[in-house]
Amino acid sequence: KPLKRVTESDMDQCMKLNVYSAISAIQGFQENLKNNNGSIVLFSSVAAQKGFANHTIIASAKAALEGLTVTLAAEFAPSIRVNCLAPSLTESKISQSMLKSEVVAEALAKAHPLKRLGKGNDSASIAKFLLSDESSWITGQIIGVDGGRSRLS
């Protein structure tokens, strides 16, 4: 939604859903994570760093999660690793209405260097890796899962 239509209530709702809920969940599990050399994976969006028109609300909330990621990675090291995935548009129930039109879906896919939209497994497999011991030397990272959209033309 354009900035001129953004309300404080819109911002509050998005921040509660994305940032405050993450903080609350992490606080609730912090001791358990610390005692078990745990790992946290947060979810941002390519919109937090790329800059898209009409993404004021979600980009702000997701950028806050990216800040939270690096701050908590520093605070919790060495006992808890914290990373963040930043996917681009992914085929899902949430994006279904946007992708109804084949023309729109094709245009959105072409905006990505890999010429397709994301699938749930694209992010899930990386999250699984980050939560495993195989990623024991990775923390404080924002990882684009975006078909190259954030870094390539």
List where the protein language model places each region:
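Residue(s) in the substrate-gating loop at a strand-loop-helix junction
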Residues: 45
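Short C-terminal tail/terminal secondary-structure segment
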Residues: 50, 128, 139-153
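Active-site helix of classical SDR
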Residues: 26, 61
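A conserved structural motif in NAD(P)-dependent oxidoreductases
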Residues: 112-123, 134
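Substrate-binding pocket helix/loop in short-chain dehydrogenase/reductase
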Residues: 1-3, 7-12, 104-108
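Active-site loop-to-helix junction immediately N-terminal to the catalytic Tyr of the SDR YXXXK motif
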Residues: 6, 51-59, 71
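Alpha-helical segment proximal to the catalytic Tyr-Lys
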Residues: 31, 73-78, 136
